[in-house]
Protein backbone atom coordinates (compact mmCIF):
# COMPACT_ATOMS: atom_id res chain seq x y z
CA UNK A 1 0.00 0.00 0.00
CA UNK A 2 1.05 3.58 -0.66
CA UNK A 3 0.97 4.44 3.06
CA UNK A 4 3.39 1.59 3.82
CA UNK A 5 5.92 2.79 1.24
CA UNK A 6 5.50 6.38 2.44
CA UNK A 7 6.30 5.29 5.98
CA UNK A 8 9.29 3.28 4.75
CA UNK A 9 10.52 6.28 2.78
CA UNK A 10 10.15 8.53 5.82
CA UNK A 11 12.03 5.97 7.91
CA UNK A 12 14.89 5.91 5.39
CA UNK A 13 15.04 9.69 5.27
CA UNK A 14 15.03 9.83 9.06
CA UNK A 15 17.97 7.39 9.18
CA UNK A 16 19.81 9.49 6.61
CA UNK A 17 19.28 12.67 8.62
CA UNK A 18 20.59 10.91 11.69
CA UNK A 19 23.71 9.92 9.75
CA UNK A 20 24.37 13.33 8.17
CA UNK A 21 24.93 15.17 11.49
CA UNK A 22 27.32 12.43 12.53
CA UNK A 23 29.50 13.09 9.50
CA UNK A 24 28.93 16.83 9.75
CA UNK A 25 30.40 16.69 13.26
CA UNK A 26 33.31 14.65 11.91
CA UNK A 27 33.79 17.20 9.15
CA UNK A 28 33.60 20.33 11.26
CA UNK A 29 34.89 19.43 14.69
CA UNK A 30 35.63 15.73 14.41
CA UNK A 31 38.90 14.12 15.29
CA UNK A 32 41.40 14.46 12.46
CA UNK A 33 43.94 12.37 14.32
CA UNK A 34 44.40 9.29 12.17
CA UNK A 35 44.28 6.01 14.12
CA UNK A 36 47.48 3.99 13.83
CA UNK A 37 45.80 1.17 11.91
CA UNK A 38 44.45 3.64 9.33
CA UNK A 39 47.73 5.53 9.08
CA UNK A 40 49.54 2.26 8.41
CA UNK A 41 47.01 1.35 5.70
CA UNK A 42 47.23 4.79 4.09
CA UNK A 43 51.03 4.80 4.12
CA UNK A 44 51.23 1.37 2.51
CA UNK A 45 48.81 2.40 -0.24
CA UNK A 46 50.67 5.64 -0.86
CA UNK A 47 53.94 3.77 -1.21
CA UNK A 48 52.35 1.32 -3.61
CA UNK A 49 50.27 3.63 -5.80
CA UNK A 50 51.78 7.12 -5.41
CA UNK A 51 55.32 6.94 -3.99
CA UNK A 52 56.34 10.12 -5.86
CA UNK A 53 53.79 12.92 -5.40
CA UNK A 54 55.26 14.75 -8.37
CA UNK A 55 53.82 12.18 -10.77
CA UNK A 56 50.91 10.54 -8.88
CA UNK A 57 48.42 11.76 -6.29
CA UNK A 58 47.03 10.13 -3.18
CA UNK A 59 46.00 13.15 -1.11
CA UNK A 60 43.36 11.97 1.34
CA UNK A 61 41.83 13.96 4.19
CA UNK A 62 40.27 11.92 7.01
CA UNK A 63 37.63 13.05 9.54
CA UNK A 64 36.73 10.55 12.27
CA UNK A 65 33.85 10.16 14.68
CA UNK A 66 34.42 6.87 16.44
CA UNK A 67 34.36 4.14 13.80
CA UNK A 68 32.83 6.51 11.24
CA UNK A 69 35.14 8.24 8.78
CA UNK A 70 34.65 10.78 6.05
CA UNK A 71 37.13 10.67 3.15
CA UNK A 72 37.87 13.75 1.08
CA UNK A 73 40.63 14.72 -1.31
CA UNK A 74 41.90 13.43 -4.65
CA UNK A 75 43.84 10.54 -6.13
CA UNK A 76 44.97 9.64 -9.62
CA UNK A 77 44.58 5.92 -8.88
CA UNK A 78 41.17 4.25 -8.86
CA UNK A 79 42.93 1.12 -7.59
CA UNK A 80 44.27 3.03 -4.59
CA UNK A 81 40.79 4.30 -3.71
CA UNK A 82 39.27 0.81 -3.98
CA UNK A 83 42.03 -0.64 -1.82
CA UNK A 84 41.50 2.11 0.78
CA UNK A 85 37.74 1.54 0.96
CA UNK A 86 38.21 -2.23 1.21
CA UNK A 87 40.87 -1.84 3.87
CA UNK A 88 38.74 0.50 5.99
CA UNK A 89 35.72 -1.81 5.71
CA UNK A 90 37.80 -4.76 6.89
CA UNK A 91 38.83 -2.73 9.93
CA UNK A 92 35.19 -2.05 10.79
CA UNK A 93 34.88 1.57 9.64
CA UNK A 94 31.69 3.04 8.15
CA UNK A 95 32.82 5.31 5.33
CA UNK A 96 31.31 8.43 3.80
CA UNK A 97 33.21 8.50 0.52
CA UNK A 98 33.90 11.96 -0.92
CA UNK A 99 37.33 10.99 -2.30
CA UNK A 100 37.59 12.00 -5.95
CA UNK A 101 39.43 10.00 -8.59
CA UNK A 102 41.11 12.17 -11.23
CA UNK A 103 40.60 13.07 -13.98
CA UNK A 104 37.29 14.68 -13.05
CA UNK A 105 35.55 13.79 -16.32
CA UNK A 106 32.18 15.27 -15.35
CA UNK A 107 33.64 18.57 -14.14
CA UNK A 108 35.81 18.83 -17.24
CA UNK A 109 32.87 18.02 -19.54
CA UNK A 110 34.87 15.37 -21.38
CA UNK A 111 37.84 17.63 -22.13
CA UNK A 112 40.37 15.61 -20.17
CA UNK A 113 43.30 16.60 -22.38
CA UNK A 114 44.88 19.86 -23.37
CA UNK A 115 47.54 21.49 -25.53
CA UNK A 116 49.89 24.21 -24.28
CA UNK A 117 48.73 27.42 -25.96
CA UNK A 118 51.49 29.92 -25.06
CA UNK A 119 55.21 29.85 -25.78
CA UNK A 120 56.05 28.81 -22.22
CA UNK A 121 53.44 28.16 -19.53
CA UNK A 122 54.30 28.16 -15.84
CA UNK A 123 53.09 25.20 -13.79
CA UNK A 124 52.64 25.74 -10.06
CA UNK A 125 52.16 23.86 -6.80
CA UNK A 126 48.74 25.45 -6.21
CA UNK A 127 46.21 27.31 -8.40
CA UNK A 128 47.53 30.78 -7.62
CA UNK A 129 50.06 33.12 -9.25
CA UNK A 130 51.84 33.50 -5.90
CA UNK A 131 52.35 29.74 -5.62
CA UNK A 132 55.78 28.19 -6.16
CA UNK A 133 56.57 27.27 -9.75
CA UNK A 134 57.22 23.55 -10.29
CA UNK A 135 58.01 23.27 -14.00
CA UNK A 136 57.05 24.64 -17.41
CA UNK A 137 55.34 23.47 -20.58
CA UNK A 138 56.08 24.40 -24.19
CA UNK A 139 53.60 25.46 -26.86
CA UNK A 140 52.08 22.50 -28.69
CA UNK A 141 52.84 20.09 -25.84
CA UNK A 142 49.99 17.65 -25.15
CA UNK A 143 48.92 17.31 -21.53
CA UNK A 144 46.39 15.36 -19.53
CA UNK A 145 43.85 17.56 -17.72
CA UNK A 146 42.97 16.18 -14.30
CA UNK A 147 40.91 18.84 -12.56
CA UNK A 148 39.50 22.36 -12.93
CA UNK A 149 39.38 24.85 -10.09
CA UNK A 150 39.60 28.21 -11.83
CA UNK A 151 42.97 26.90 -13.00
CA UNK A 152 43.68 23.48 -14.49
CA UNK A 153 45.57 20.71 -12.76
CA UNK A 154 47.47 18.91 -15.52
CA UNK A 155 49.98 16.14 -16.12
CA UNK A 156 52.79 16.68 -18.64
CA UNK A 157 54.45 14.10 -20.94
CA UNK A 158 57.13 13.48 -18.30
CA UNK A 159 54.21 12.72 -15.91
CA UNK A 160 54.73 15.81 -13.74
CA UNK A 161 51.52 17.04 -12.08
CA UNK A 162 50.95 20.75 -11.40
CA UNK A 163 48.51 23.65 -11.79
CA UNK A 164 48.40 25.98 -14.81
CA UNK A 165 46.40 29.15 -15.40
CA UNK A 166 43.53 28.61 -17.85
CA UNK A 167 45.19 30.81 -20.49
CA UNK A 168 48.18 28.45 -20.59
CA UNK A 169 46.42 25.51 -22.22
CA UNK A 170 43.63 24.82 -24.69
CA UNK A 171 41.41 22.01 -23.29
CA UNK A 172 40.42 19.33 -25.81
CA UNK A 173 38.78 15.92 -26.03
CA UNK A 174 40.83 12.82 -26.72
CA UNK A 175 39.67 12.90 -30.36
CA UNK A 176 40.76 16.52 -30.73
CA UNK A 177 44.15 15.72 -29.21
CA UNK A 178 44.59 12.83 -31.65
CA UNK A 179 43.84 15.22 -34.53
CA UNK A 180 46.43 17.67 -33.20
CA UNK A 181 49.06 14.95 -32.74
CA UNK A 182 48.49 13.67 -36.28
CA UNK A 183 48.62 17.10 -37.94
CA UNK A 184 51.80 18.24 -39.70
CA UNK A 185 53.64 20.74 -37.57
CA UNK A 186 56.32 23.38 -37.60
CA UNK A 187 59.00 23.12 -34.88
CA UNK A 188 60.71 26.24 -33.55
CA UNK A 189 64.47 25.67 -33.78
CA UNK A 190 65.72 29.07 -32.60
CA UNK A 191 65.92 29.93 -28.92
CA UNK A 192 63.47 32.79 -29.34
CA UNK A 193 61.30 34.46 -31.95
CA UNK A 194 57.83 35.62 -32.95
CA UNK A 195 54.78 34.65 -34.96
CA UNK A 196 53.39 37.52 -37.06
CA UNK A 197 49.88 38.31 -38.25
CA UNK A 198 51.13 38.63 -41.84
CA UNK A 199 54.13 37.13 -43.70
CA UNK A 200 56.23 40.14 -42.72
CA UNK A 201 58.27 40.97 -39.65
CA UNK A 202 56.86 44.50 -39.90
CA UNK A 203 53.35 43.21 -39.14
CA UNK A 204 51.67 42.82 -35.76
CA UNK A 205 53.03 40.00 -33.61
CA UNK A 206 50.62 37.24 -32.60
CA UNK A 207 52.87 35.84 -29.87
CA UNK A 208 56.43 34.98 -29.02
CA UNK A 209 57.84 31.48 -29.47
CA UNK A 210 60.66 29.52 -27.85
CA UNK A 211 62.80 26.56 -28.85
CA UNK A 212 60.83 23.33 -29.07
CA UNK A 213 57.46 25.02 -29.63
CA UNK A 214 55.19 23.23 -32.08
CA UNK A 215 52.47 24.81 -34.23
CA UNK A 216 50.18 23.31 -36.84
CA UNK A 217 51.47 23.80 -40.39
CA UNK A 218 48.86 25.48 -42.60
CA UNK A 219 50.95 26.39 -45.64
CA UNK A 220 53.89 28.38 -46.98
CA UNK A 221 54.15 31.97 -48.16
CA UNK A 222 57.53 33.26 -49.29
CA UNK A 223 60.01 33.16 -46.42
CA UNK A 224 57.32 32.22 -43.91
CA UNK A 225 55.31 29.21 -42.81
CA UNK A 226 51.64 29.78 -42.13
CA UNK A 227 50.82 28.22 -38.76
CA UNK A 228 47.86 27.64 -36.45
CA UNK A 229 47.79 27.59 -32.66
CA UNK A 230 45.99 24.96 -30.59
CA UNK A 231 43.11 27.41 -30.05
CA UNK A 232 42.79 28.15 -33.77
CA UNK A 233 44.64 31.47 -34.01
CA UNK A 234 46.77 31.79 -37.12
CA UNK A 235 49.95 33.57 -38.07
CA UNK A 236 53.25 33.39 -39.92
CA UNK A 237 56.67 32.30 -38.67
CA UNK A 238 59.99 32.85 -40.41
CA UNK A 239 61.61 29.82 -42.02
CA UNK A 240 64.90 31.00 -40.53
CA UNK A 241 63.80 30.06 -37.00
CA UNK A 242 61.64 27.01 -37.68
CA UNK A 243 61.36 23.80 -39.67
CA UNK A 244 58.68 21.27 -40.70
CA UNK A 245 58.62 18.54 -38.07
CA UNK A 246 59.26 15.70 -40.52
CA UNK A 247 62.30 17.47 -41.97
CA UNK A 248 63.50 18.32 -38.46
CA UNK A 249 63.30 14.67 -37.43
CA UNK A 250 65.08 13.53 -40.61
CA UNK A 251 68.03 15.85 -39.94
CA UNK A 252 68.04 15.37 -36.18
CA UNK A 253 71.17 14.04 -34.48
CA UNK A 254 71.13 12.44 -31.05
CA UNK A 255 74.87 11.95 -30.60
CA UNK A 256 76.84 13.47 -27.75
CA UNK A 257 78.70 16.03 -29.88
CA UNK A 258 75.47 17.47 -31.32
CA UNK A 259 73.77 17.60 -27.93
CA UNK A 260 76.78 19.28 -26.31
CA UNK A 261 76.79 21.86 -29.12
CA UNK A 262 73.15 22.65 -28.31
CA UNK A 263 74.03 22.94 -24.63
CA UNK A 264 76.80 25.41 -25.49
CA UNK A 265 74.33 27.49 -27.52
CA UNK A 266 72.51 28.24 -24.26
CA UNK A 267 75.58 29.64 -22.49
CA UNK A 268 74.70 32.62 -20.31
CA UNK A 269 70.95 31.97 -20.21
CA UNK A 270 69.90 32.85 -16.65
CA UNK A 271 69.02 30.35 -13.97
CA UNK A 272 65.30 30.15 -13.29
CA UNK A 273 63.86 27.92 -10.58
CA UNK A 274 61.57 25.36 -12.32
CA UNK A 275 62.54 26.75 -15.73
CA UNK A 276 62.54 24.31 -18.65
CA UNK A 277 62.79 26.59 -21.67
CA UNK A 278 65.28 28.69 -23.57
CA UNK A 279 64.00 31.70 -21.61
CA UNK A 280 65.45 30.38 -18.35
CA UNK A 281 66.40 27.03 -16.84
CA UNK A 282 67.22 25.41 -13.54
CA UNK A 283 69.82 22.62 -13.47
CA UNK A 284 67.54 19.72 -14.40
CA UNK A 285 65.44 21.95 -16.63
CA UNK A 286 68.60 22.71 -18.60
CA UNK A 287 69.22 19.00 -19.16
CA UNK A 288 65.59 18.46 -20.10
CA UNK A 289 65.53 21.43 -22.51
CA UNK A 290 68.76 20.51 -24.27
CA UNK A 291 67.69 16.91 -24.75
CA UNK A 292 64.16 17.90 -25.82
CA UNK A 293 65.69 20.02 -28.59
CA UNK A 294 66.99 16.66 -29.85
CA UNK A 295 63.57 15.02 -29.39
CA UNK A 296 64.58 13.21 -26.18
CA UNK A 297 62.17 13.28 -23.23
CA UNK A 298 63.60 12.59 -19.77
CA UNK A 299 62.10 12.98 -16.28
CA UNK A 300 61.79 16.50 -14.93
CA UNK A 301 63.91 16.68 -11.75
CA UNK A 302 67.54 15.80 -11.06
CA UNK A 303 66.49 13.24 -8.44
CA UNK A 304 64.36 11.54 -11.13
CA UNK A 305 66.89 11.87 -13.94
CA UNK A 306 69.39 10.08 -11.71
CA UNK A 307 67.48 6.83 -12.20
CA UNK A 308 67.35 6.65 -15.99
CA UNK A 309 70.02 5.09 -18.19
CA UNK A 310 73.11 3.30 -16.92
CA UNK A 311 74.57 4.16 -13.52
CA UNK A 312 78.27 5.10 -13.79
CA UNK A 313 80.66 5.19 -10.85
CA UNK A 314 83.06 8.06 -11.39
CA UNK A 315 86.72 7.01 -11.26
CA UNK A 316 89.21 9.33 -9.49
CA UNK A 317 90.70 10.26 -12.88
CA UNK A 318 87.22 10.57 -14.51
CA UNK A 319 88.20 7.93 -17.07
CA UNK A 320 84.81 6.21 -16.72
CA UNK A 321 82.97 9.24 -18.05
CA UNK A 322 82.01 9.91 -21.66
CA UNK A 323 80.88 13.22 -23.18
CA UNK A 324 77.10 13.45 -22.91
CA UNK A 325 76.89 11.61 -19.58
CA UNK A 326 74.73 13.28 -16.94
CA UNK A 327 76.62 13.95 -13.72
CA UNK A 328 74.91 14.33 -10.36
CA UNK A 329 75.80 16.27 -7.24
CA UNK A 330 74.46 16.48 -3.73
CA UNK A 331 74.76 15.13 -0.22
CA UNK A 332 76.81 11.98 0.12
CA UNK A 333 75.47 9.08 2.15
CA UNK A 334 76.50 8.71 5.78
CA UNK A 335 75.55 6.10 8.38
CA UNK A 336 72.85 8.53 9.55
CA UNK A 337 71.55 9.97 6.27
CA UNK A 338 70.77 8.75 2.78
CA UNK A 339 72.43 10.09 -0.34
CA UNK A 340 70.50 13.04 -1.79
CA UNK A 341 70.74 14.34 -5.38
CA UNK A 342 70.26 18.12 -5.65
CA UNK A 343 72.07 19.16 -8.84
CA UNK A 344 72.83 17.84 -12.34
CA UNK A 345 75.06 18.80 -15.25
CA UNK A 346 76.42 17.26 -18.44
CA UNK A 347 79.97 16.01 -18.87
CA UNK A 348 81.59 17.50 -21.99
CA UNK A 349 85.04 15.89 -21.80
CA UNK A 350 88.49 16.88 -20.51
CA UNK A 351 87.15 16.95 -16.91
CA UNK A 352 84.74 19.77 -17.82
CA UNK A 353 80.98 19.93 -17.45
CA UNK A 354 78.20 22.32 -18.46
CA UNK A 355 75.36 23.14 -16.08
CA UNK A 356 72.94 25.82 -14.92
CA UNK A 357 74.01 27.46 -11.68
CA UNK A 358 73.31 31.19 -11.65
CA UNK A 359 73.39 30.92 -15.42
CA UNK A 360 74.37 28.28 -17.96
CA UNK A 361 78.14 27.90 -17.63
CA UNK A 362 81.07 25.53 -18.06
CA UNK A 363 83.18 24.44 -15.09
CA UNK A 364 85.96 21.94 -14.46
CA UNK A 365 86.89 19.23 -11.99
CA UNK A 366 90.60 19.89 -12.54
CA UNK A 367 92.40 22.16 -10.05
CA UNK A 368 94.73 23.16 -12.89
CA UNK A 369 91.86 24.51 -15.01
CA UNK A 370 90.90 28.19 -14.80
CA UNK A 371 87.26 27.00 -14.67
CA UNK A 372 87.89 24.76 -11.64
CA UNK A 373 84.80 24.33 -9.44
CA UNK A 374 85.94 23.12 -6.03
CA UNK A 375 82.45 23.34 -4.54
CA UNK A 376 80.82 21.01 -7.05
CA UNK A 377 83.80 18.64 -7.07
CA UNK A 378 83.28 18.24 -3.33
CA UNK A 379 79.67 17.16 -3.76
CA UNK A 380 80.05 15.02 -6.89
CA UNK A 381 78.12 11.74 -6.55
CA UNK A 382 77.86 9.68 -9.75
CA UNK A 383 76.89 9.79 -13.42
CA UNK A 384 74.36 8.19 -15.73
CA UNK A 385 74.69 7.32 -19.42
CA UNK A 386 71.34 7.98 -21.10
CA UNK A 387 71.95 8.23 -24.86
CA UNK A 388 72.22 4.47 -25.55
CA UNK A 389 68.92 3.88 -23.72
CA UNK A 390 66.54 6.18 -25.60
CA UNK A 391 63.22 4.37 -26.13
CA UNK A 392 64.57 1.40 -24.18
CA UNK A 393 63.21 2.66 -20.86
CA UNK A 394 59.68 3.84 -20.13
CA UNK A 395 60.79 7.23 -18.82
CA UNK A 396 63.39 7.86 -21.54
CA UNK A 397 61.59 8.36 -24.84
CA UNK A 398 60.84 10.68 -27.78
CA UNK A 399 57.79 12.48 -29.19
CA UNK A 400 57.33 9.54 -31.56
CA UNK A 401 57.00 7.03 -28.72
CA UNK A 402 55.80 9.03 -25.70
CA UNK A 403 52.15 8.12 -24.95
CA UNK A 404 51.04 11.76 -24.76
CA UNK A 405 52.23 12.47 -28.30
CA UNK A 406 50.88 9.25 -29.80
CA UNK A 407 47.25 9.36 -28.66
Language model features: what each stretch is:
Residues 13-19, 26-70, 74-136, 141, ...:
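N-terminal targeting leaders
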Residues 82, 86-107, 156-187, 200, ...:
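Boundary regions of SH3-family modules and the immediately adjacent low-complexity/disordered segments
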Residues 116-139, 188-217, 271:
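Beta-loop motif signature
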Residues 140, 152-156, 164, 212, ...:
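SH3/SH3-like beta-barrel fold
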Residues 171-174, 193, 200-203, 243, ...:
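Aromatic- and glycine-rich peptidoglycan recognition patches
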Residues 263, 275-294:
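Active-site nucleophilic cysteine motif
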Residues 298-362, 368:
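...with weaker cross-activation on analogous glycine-rich loops/strands in unrelated enzymes
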Amino acid sequence: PKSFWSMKKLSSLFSLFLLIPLFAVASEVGDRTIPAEVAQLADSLKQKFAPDKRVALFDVDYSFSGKNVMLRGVTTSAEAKTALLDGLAKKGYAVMDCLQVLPDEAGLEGKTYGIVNVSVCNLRVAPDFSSEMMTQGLMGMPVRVLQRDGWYRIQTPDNYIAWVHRVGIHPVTREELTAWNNAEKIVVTSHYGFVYSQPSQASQTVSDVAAGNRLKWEGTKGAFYKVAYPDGRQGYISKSISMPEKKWRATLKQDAASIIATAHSMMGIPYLWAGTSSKGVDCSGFMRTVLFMHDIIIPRDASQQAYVGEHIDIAPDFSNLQPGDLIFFGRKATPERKERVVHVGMYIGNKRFIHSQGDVRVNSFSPDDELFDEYNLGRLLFATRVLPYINKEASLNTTETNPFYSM
